[in-house]
Amino acid sequence: MECCAPVIGEILRLMYESTFSRVANAIKFKSNVKALNESLERLTELKGNMSEDHETLLTKDKPLRLKLMRWQREAEEVISKARLKLEERVSCGMSLRPRMSRKLVKILDEVKMLEKDGIEFVDMLSVESTPERVEHVPGVSVVHQTMASNMLAKIRDGLTSEKAQKIGVWGMGGVGKTTLVRTLNNKLREEGATQPFGLVIFVIVSKEFDPREVQKQIAERLDIDTQMEESEEKLARRIYVGLMKERKFLLILDDVWKPIDLDLLGIPRTEENKGSKVILTSRFLEVCRSMKTDLDVRVDCLLEEDAWELFCKNAGDVVRSDHVRKIAKAVSQECGGLPLAIITVGTAMRGKKNVKLWNHVLSKLSKSVPWIKSIEEKIFQPLKLSYDFLEDKAKFCFLLCALFPEDYSIEVTEVVRYWMAEGFMEELGSQEDSMNEGITTVESLKDYCLLEDGDRRDTVKMHDVVRDFAIWIMSSSQDDSHSLVMSGTGLQDIRQDKLAPSLRRVSLMNNKLESLPDLVEEFCVKTSVLLLQGNFLLKEVPIGFLQAFPTLRILNLSGTRIKSFPSCSLLRLFSLHSLFLRDCFKLVKLPSLETLAKLELLDLCGTHILEFPRGLEELKRFRHLDLSRTLHLESIPARVVSRLSSLETLDMTSSHYRWSVQGETQKGQATVEEIGCLQRLQVLSIRLHSSPFLLNKRNTWIKRLKKFQLVVGSRYILRTRHDKRRLTISHLNVSQVSIGWLLAYTTSLALNHCQGIEAMMKKLVSDNKGFKNLKSLTIENVIINTNSWVEMVSTNTSKQSSDILDLLPNLEELHLRRVDLETFSELQTHLGLKLETLKIIEITMCRKLRTLLDKRNFLTIPNLEEIEISYCDSLQNLHEALLYHQPFVPNLRVLKLRNLPNLVSICNWGEVWECLEQVEVIHCNQLNCLPISSTCGRIKKIKGELSWWERLEWDDPSALTTVQPFFNPVREVPLLIADATTQML
């Protein structure tokens, strides 16, 4: 028995455990059901979270993918089995619950095991699928280049600004746009976790835009695998999901040639993913605009010092040697700061020690000759991509700009007139319409970085390398572009072998030609443009030379010393459209022009002709005549001008000839009534003899004009920004004329040395008629009877404030010169000016002026942007009511104060003008406070004497530190008292 005891004990133990387990399972039936339901829900969710992105990722790892597929299959089976058992337990009786409970526990164990394996899969896939935040992009850095560093800083500022969701980086080919954004990308990588983006994606787009290829680059950074058979739409959805998971992303699209629809690529809109940004680089500003960028950063060429350093880096130490350095610097400068050109030329000259070789290269570059093949391949071919992108019309317009010398600022109107003469501008009805179309083309070429702003207003120029490229196109072409360009090269003579029958354009302008050769008649049979202007030594143009160009459309002899022009009947220039003889100051007479049947433009500005050109009245297509600055023009025969039926522009600005009304003029001379007969006239600039014209309100033909400049009285010109329709009255008693009818059409009025202004103003006020078109008013050399003003002020101000007439409701500019006002308020109150639109005030040599606004005047001038005051000895302040609670000029951008010895203050202590950008204070020694604080973030330049700057007192001590970098000291010279200028002119 004793030996059986252990066996019996074990049997009883097993029976107890089995029974206990059954009882326990029966008791825990409900809890087991609940636990299985919860685990089953987690497993189902886990299986669903094994996203398509994870599956496609694992195609790179076949064994791992097989394990995942097996897990998913097992999970599916267990989930199905568990759901089936859970359904069965509903109909399970109490007696069967222990068995059912045991089965549920078994399935629960399987579910938990699969759940554990699934979690391990997810963790492993999360590690595998997490892309590097920023990948290094190989390339040189620009961090040590001044200009590039500034542009990089602008982009970085944009990345931190909530207003800049999309940033455009644009510039000409080879200027370094890609290098700039590569540097940005790599700087972000160096910053690691401190940079703000969860993911930075650098994508190369290129000219041949392939949406699929761009999507593939983005998908690769997101570790999304792409399938050949997968549609762009489906891939876009997966990219969208991937990017939306990122906290913030930065997408850099490099080399964009056409606008891209980011939605079609799957890029979330920036408002959907706050803080995310898109940067794109393009050669074309228009692409940036089309893609609705919020900030556009133009990449400019390198500064000279940075360009030299880059050249040295590529050319080697030889360029620093004494015998090469000077000529090497000149070669570097010929590259115009364009990095691509600097690298190409520098590399080609690397290690070259022979000075003659360097001189040869410099000579070739200065003549726009590609002296090595790599210049064509590495510089011109990339630029040709931009050129090929242009429409044919724009290509011709671009090439024509290369006819001008290197670094030449081209007048936009001049080049557009060339385009019009060549037939590049469509016939849009009027010359002004065609001119506007041409200006639009100029702007588009600027947006393509093929033209840039010139040194003067309304001019453009070509970058040296771009011009070399254009000349390369023209010289190597044998089609309609084939041209000879030798402008600005110091040429002293032109040989016949330089010319060829295939040439379409010939530019010999700005040289030292003294004579021109006789050529074979009709030798250059295709040449339509011949530019000879700027040859100051040229005294004669032989008939034999011009006869070689029978198809000329444009002939420019401006700035030469020719005394006469060959007989037009002998020249047979039957296709000539435009003849430019501007500033031929020796030219006193022209032959009859009646045989130039297609002539539309004649420019005689600055010539010494004595009489009106003959034969123009026979030309049915003639549209533009420039007789400005013809200081010796004395005669215009009657009934000639009225026959110029197609004339659209008559410019006689500063001409000696003065027009008179019928009955006043000398017998046989033209009268102003003839001008009224010109139904197509749109632009007119003339000088009228005296006031009778102003008395004739029947001259309503004035309202047909789109532009006019009428000078009544003595010759007087003062340019403003609103000269579109300008009336100048000089040395007349204006109380004897009625100008109200003319002011209705006028945008700018100038009164110089006029009497009776008080009476004229009184009449205008009493007529209760404002002039809404007038935007600029100039009053100069006028003594005003202030007693009369008081009377007129009381007349106007006696009305209810709402009834007070604002005589000039849209006035934007006001110029006062040598006017004896004590305050600007006198003029403002007298005319009832509310000054709501005034942008510019310019006051000079008003010796009695003590303040702008007096104590009675508490108004602000809300839109005033510029104040310029000089030589006003009595001026003490700008506003007498210095305790006014807000700046009276809240939007002032430019403040220029010169030679104001008694000026003490311009603002309250501590007052800040937040919009100030430019300040100039010269010889204002008592002024010791500026309305500037450390919050003035728009300041660009402050100009003044160093001694004055050091005496300034600052309410905000940190303001000095903030604006000190923008201070430009001027040379201190004694105050000049302009006695001569105080005399009435």
Curated annotation (Swiss-Prot):
GO terms for biological process: defense response. Residues 167-429 form the NB-ARC domain. The keyword Nucleotide-binding applies. Residues 24-88 form a coiled coil. GO terms for molecular function: ADP binding; ATP binding. LRR repeats lie at residues 502-523, 526-547, 551-572, 575-597, 598-620, 621-643. ATP binds at residues 171-178. Disease resistance protein. The LRR repeats probably act as specificity determinant of pathogen recognition. This is Disease resistance protein At4g27190. The lineage of its organism: Eukaryota, Viridiplantae, Streptophyta, Embryophyta, Tracheophyta.
